[in-house]
Each structure stands twice: as C-alpha cells, then as structure tokens.
Amino acid sequence: MILTLTLNPSVDISYPLTALKLDDVNRVQEVSKTAGGKGLNVTRVLAQVGEPVLASGFIGGELGQFIAKKLDHADIKHAFYNIKGETRNCIAILHEGQQTEILEQGPEIDNQEAAGFIKHFEQLLEKVEAVAISGSLPKGLNQDYYAQIIERCQNKGVPVILDCSGATLQTVLENPYKPTVIKPNISELYQLLNQPLDESLESLKQAVSQPLFEGIEWIIVSLGAQGAFAKHNHTFYRVNIPTISVLNPVGSGDSTVAGITSAILNHENDHDLLKKANTLGMLNAQEAQTGYVNLNNYDDLFNQIEVLEV
C-alpha cells in the first residue's frame, strides 16, 4: 500500500471563457470542480495504474467533505485528518489561450491539529510500504514538519518520495533524516544551491553531487520537453523522451511522482523506474484533465524513451 500526503488540498475550480472581461460580468457555461492538490493528482494516477493507494492530509468544512466525496466516487481510499478550518478553493480562469489563477491560502493549522496529525500518520504508517509527499505546507505548520514525517518513515524503513520546493525542501535537506527520492527542476535546483546552472551533463552532475544532497538515494531532475537527468546513489542517467503533442502539462510532474512511487514500491530497476516515471508524465500532458493518464498509449511511449548511463 502507498500512502499519499496532501497537507494543503483544495477544491480546484476551472472556468473556461472565450474572453475574460475585466470589470464586467463573465458567464460560464461549463464549470469543472475536482479534488485538487499535487498529492491527490499523484493518488489518482496511482489508482489508474492499479496500485493500492491511501490518501491522507488535512481537510475541513464543506469543501473538505467535497474532496472526500469526490474520492469516494472514484473508489479511492482515504484517511484524512479533520480540522476546524475550511479547505481552500483554487480557481483557474481559462481564457484566450491563457490561464489566470486565483489561489486561496487555505486554513491555518493550530498546534493541537499539527500534533494530532502526526499521531494519525504514525498509525497509517504501520500499514503502508511507501509514502509520497507532495505540495506546500499549510499556514501554521513549522518548516520542519515534513522532516518530522520523514524521520518517522525512516525509523520504520519506509521509503519517502518528496515533491516540494523552496524553504520547505531546504529544511528537509538540512535535516539528518532524508527522503529516498526528490524531484526538483532546474529552477528549484538553482534556488537551493544559489549558483548558475545549465542543462549540460557536467553542470547537472556537479549540482546534484553537492553536500546538501548527501544521503538521498535518488535525485531526479525534470528537464521538461528535454526529458530528465537523474542520480541514483553514485550512478548518473540522462533520460531522452520523444516529442509529443501537449494538451495540458499541469499535473505532469505529479504523474511522474506516481510513476516513481510505483516503481519504488515494486523494486523496479533504474531504467524501468525512469521510463515509467517519464511515460506517466507524458501521458498526463496529452490529456485535458489533470491527474489523468490514458494507459492505451503507455507501451508505445515507454518503448520510445531512452535511458543512458552518463
């Protein structure tokens, strides 16, 4: 069983408009409302590829119950921790080929709720074999909250796949308890190291070999349409992917995390892990719906990906 954590989930609302009129009424004919958050995208893709998955995190109020019901309808198991605050909305206005987003901050977690979730998590940890942590921390939690979770996973021998950025990731990396996998992109690497980077092999090798990343088994760097670069222990890989028609890239990173987590759970070899992860990321990009993959195209894309030891 895989446990996914989305500590700051949202109800994602999409408003498609022919044109956005400012300071005027905009009428929307089709509204899409989904259970949102990076970790829930990971959850949906894991469920689609047939992995046993359990979703957890903080939810509160009517919007929190909406998320739970959406997962129920998709037959996805969940064990959320209920809080006093209201789960947030995240609104995307799609207009003239552009996307304008309005993101609520979300609820503030108090000390009692923060401690309560850790105890809740410790109980869930007893019955899972891998943990995928995605997205930002809600207001009120200390920057080392993910580090506290990772410490408990490491004490139980449970691998952790972590997808976050900024100060939260920096805090984790400076902690003695390390995740099994991190998945930064080039700009996130730059923020962490505060040094110039490019996509050359030497630059990437030097970056991921910095002392900051010591103790992390897998570092997988997304290069967008150029594929990926990875370091597994002391081995480096370059991943070349085919050119595809991209319909909606949002959620592709989360689908990649789902592939990594699935491969870690099933003890797949390095090449298959990298190919599975990138295949699911590309499949998501070919769909309008975020966190959805059409597995009919899986084998074709998987076989076109090239993984080279460099």
Swiss-Prot record:
GO terms for biological process: D-tagatose 6-phosphate catabolic process; lactose catabolic process via tagatose-6-phosphate. One of its GO terms (molecular function) is phosphofructokinase activity. It comes from the Bacteria. Pfam families: PfkB (PF00294). Pathway: Carbohydrate metabolism; D-tagatose 6-phosphate degradation; D-glyceraldehyde 3-phosphate and glycerone phosphate from D-tagatose 6-phosphate: step 1/2. Keywords: ATP-binding, Kinase, Lactose metabolism, Nucleotide-binding, Transferase. It is an enzyme of class 2 (transferase). PROSITE patterns: PFKB_KINASES_1, PFKB_KINASES_2. Coiled coil: none annotated. InterPro entries: Carboh/pur_kinase_PfkB_CS, LacC, PfkB_dom, Ribokinase-like, Tagatose/fructose_Pkinase. Its EC number is 2.7.1.144. It catalyses: D-tagatofuranose 6-phosphate + ATP = D-tagatofuranose 1,6-bisphosphate + ADP + H(+). GO terms for cellular component: cytosol. Belongs to the carbohydrate kinase PfkB family. LacC subfamily. HAMAP family: LacC. This is Tagatose-6-phosphate kinase. It comes from Staphylococcus aureus (strain NCTC 8325 / PS 47).
